[in-house]
Each structure stands twice: as structure tokens, then as C-alpha cells.
């Protein structure tokens, strides 16, 4: 039985070309990048090269890239680091109700520490507006954090509009771009973004890698203490193989962005058309106009999502009910709850399909046929 992986928004397989670049550095470039001898200088060269390439990709300066262990750490450093560094200027933070839990739980922690958090509502497409942000801004607002593209329903937020609004305000603008990076072109200067989080394993790079872009004008308090790595902002010996892999994954995603976007959009159409041809009733969750190309969230009226997922897994098709970080949770999706309310049937009858490396049109059609068969059997 062929297994079909359509859960790339949870994690993506590593591109073999990325692995090829990493392998020599597991044993070859083993020197500590902070050491002044030749072994250390060799490792430092690879780290600096990666930093320069990644910075250029988003229109940043090299010193504005902080390597992290992934998106969660990058989000924590952006939010906690800002809160600790700017608490004397204010204790108000604005975010949305559909953020990744790396953002939401960090904000909840700060609430317990005396910070005031405003959680913006979203419309039924999962979108906020710059107007909402403007209305929520206060003199003591020190940070606005709005994700670039949602990991569950794929809705893309009006980042440039929000950035334009905030450029004259003292509040820093952070965006969790983990799901969007590599598929949407991002220029931090043109979008007036102060802080941006990225994870390697969502773009066919290695797990345990990522970075935080922090504008040179941003002041952050470090969360890790020890050495003076990353310009004293993130202590710990650099993961040279991982950083090399992250650099290569970002390079490939940039070179192949247009091709992937076109392919994934066609996959969405194939999936939906196959369901329609089979006579299956469904609706799309999320904004159809402002959407990530690889994420498709579907609502099947009257179908138990648990039964659907189990049956699909038995058929060799891997999809999900939402964020992998809430797998096994008895609570419904906080994203769908924010969009449709606590009583909506969509909370218990929706699945997320997400496309990526290795998927073919034939696989997508086969998976959609399996979904149609299971839905018919369950209704």
C-alpha cells in the first residue's frame, strides 16, 4: 500500500540536497565557531556565510539574524525578549486569537507576570485588519505580534498594512512567518517588520533549526545565558551542520518558490474537483483570496473528524485535524473556534490537507478519492 503524506504543515521531509550539504559538517567542520584557531575559524566561516545568505533573502543585515533551535524559540525570544527589555516603557501587547501556541502560551505567561494582552478577533475567513490593530493600540503598547500565514487554515494576514500602520508607533512588530516563509516573498524592510520567526523543518530543512530576524533598532533581553554567541542575544555553541542545512533549504525554497506555488495551487484544485466529482459535500475553511498555497482546510458536514482521520490513516493517507502541536488534545481547534464560535460543527468535522515536497498530482487525486470514500461511508 502506498503511503501518501499530506501533512507538510506539521513538518516536512528533508530535501536530499539539504542533507548532502550538511553531511560533511558533522565530522569535518567540528570546531567551535567561537575558537580562534583554524578549526574554529573554518566553522565560523560556514556560519557567517549562512547568516549573510539568509539576511539577503529577506532584505536584512547580517547582524540582524539570530540563529535559534526553531520557530518556538524564535517566537519566545521575540515576545519574552521584548517584554523584558521594554517593560519600563509599557506592559501592553497585541496579538490575535489564532496564533500558534508558541505565541499564545508565551503571551499567557506574560499575563501571569502582570502584562496586559489584547487578543484580536478574526472574521470567518480567519483574518484580522489593520483597523483592528489601530483601534487596539495604546500609549503603553510595546509589541504587536500577528502571524504571517495561519498553519491550520492557511489564511494570510495583511502584514504590510499592519507594518505601515506601526512604523510611526513605538511598538515593535513581530510576525511568526514559520508557515509562510519559503512560499511567500518577504522583505522585512518594505513591510516594516521588526521581528520575524522562521523554522527550518517547515521548509524541508533540518529539525532543531531556525532563526529570528531582529531589526538593528530592536532591543531584546536574552532568554539563554552563558557564552556571547549571536552578539550576546542567544548563548550556546552554534549548530554548524544545522545552520548549513537551514541555509541550503532557504536557498532552494527561494529558487523554486514560483514553481511550488503553482503546483500546490493546482493540487488544491485537483483535490476539490475530485471531491465534487464524487458527490461529496464540503466547504473550505479560510480565506480563498488571501491564502497560503499549500494549506487546504475542509469541512465535511456531519462527519466525525476522529473517525475520518483514523480511516484515512488505515488507507495510507496522512492528514490532520489542525496543528500538530495540539495532537491528542481533547479541545477543538482554537483557530476554528475563533473563526466560527464554540458551537460550530466545523470544530469537529474539519481536516487540514497540506502539500509539499514529493507530492504528485496522482497522489493528490488518490488521496482525495480515499477521503471521498471514507466520508460517504461515515455519512
Swiss-Prot record:
Keywords: Iron, Iron-sulfur, Metal-binding, Pyridoxal phosphate, Transferase. The active site is at 325 (cysteine persulfide intermediate). [2Fe-2S] cluster binds at residue 325. Pyridoxal 5'-phosphate binds at residues 71-72, 151, 179, 199-201, 237. Its cofactor is pyridoxal 5'-phosphate. GO terms for molecular function: cysteine desulfurase activity; iron-sulfur cluster binding; metal ion binding. Pfam families: Aminotran_5. It is an enzyme of class 2 (transferase). Catalyzes the removal of elemental sulfur from cysteine to produce alanine. Belongs to the class-V pyridoxal-phosphate-dependent aminotransferase family. NifS/IscS subfamily. This is Putative cysteine desulfurase IscS 1. It comes from Bacillus subtilis (strain 168).
Amino acid at each position: 500500500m502506498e503511503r501518501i503524506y499530506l501533512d507538510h504543515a506539521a513538518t516536512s521531509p528533508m530535501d536530499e540536497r539539504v542533507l548532502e550539504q550538511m553531511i560533511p559538517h558533522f565530522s569535518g567542520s567540528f570546531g567551535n565557531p567561537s575558537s580562534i584557531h583554524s578549526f574554529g575559524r573554518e566553522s565560523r566561516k560556514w556560519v557567517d556565510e549562512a547568516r549573510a545568505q539568509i539576511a539577503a533573502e529577506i532584505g536584512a543585515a547580517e547582524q540582524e539574524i539570530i540563529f535559534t533551535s526553531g520557530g518556538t524559540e524564535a517566537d519566545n525570544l521575540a515576545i519574552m525578549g521584548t517584554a523584558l527589555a521594554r517593560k519600563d516603557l509599557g506592559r501592553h501587547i497585541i496579538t490575535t486569537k489564532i496564533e500558534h501556541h508558541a505565541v499564545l502560551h508565551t503571551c499567557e505567561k506574560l499575563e501571569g507576570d502582570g502584562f496586559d494582552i489584547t487578543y484580536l478577533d478574526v472574521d470567518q475567513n480567519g483574518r484580522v485588519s489593520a483597523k483592528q490593530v489601530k483601534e487596539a493600540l495604546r500609549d503603553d503598547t510595546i509589541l504587536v505580534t500577528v502571524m504571517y500565514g495561519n498553519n491550520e487554515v492557511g489564511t494570510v494576514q495583511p502584514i504590510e498594512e499592519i507594518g505601515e500602520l506601526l512604523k510611526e508607533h513605538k511598538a515593535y512588530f513581530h510576525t511568526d512567518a514559520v508557515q509562510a516563509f519559503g512560499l511567500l516573498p518577504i522583505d522585512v524592510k518594505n513591510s516594516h517588520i521588526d521581528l520575524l520567526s522562521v523554522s527550518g523543518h517547515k521548509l524541508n530543512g533540518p529539525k532543531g533549526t531556525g532563526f529570528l530576524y531582529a531589526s538593528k533598532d530592536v532591543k531584546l533581553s536574552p532568554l539563554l545565558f552563558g557564552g556571547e554567541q549571536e552578539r550576546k542575544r542567544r548563548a550556546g555553541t552554534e549548530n554548524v551542520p544545522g545552520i548549513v542545512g537551514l541555509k541550503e533549504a532557504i536557498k532552494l525554497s527561494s529558487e523554486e518558490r514560483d514553481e511550488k506555488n503553482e503546483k500546490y495551487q493546482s493540487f488544491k484544485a485537483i483535490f476539490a474537483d475530485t471531491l465534487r466529482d464524487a458527490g461529496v459535500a464540503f466547504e473550505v475553511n479560510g480565506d480563498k483570496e488571501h491564502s497560503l498555497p499549500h494549506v487546504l482546510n475542509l469541512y465535511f458536514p456531519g462527519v466525525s473528524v476522529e473517525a475520518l482521520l483514523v480511516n484515512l490513516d488505515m488507507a495510507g493517507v496522512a492528514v490532520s485535524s489542525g496543528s500538530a502541536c495540539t495532537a491528542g488534545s481533547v479541545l477543538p481547534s482554537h483557530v476554528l473556534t475563533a473563526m466560527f464560535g464554540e458551537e460550530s460543527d466545523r470544530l469537529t468535522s474539519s481536516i487540514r490537507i497540506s502539500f509539499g515536497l514529493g507530492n504528485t498530482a496522482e497522489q493528490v487525486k488518490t488521496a482525495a478519492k480515499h477521503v471521498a470514500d471514507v466520508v460517504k461511508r461515515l455519512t
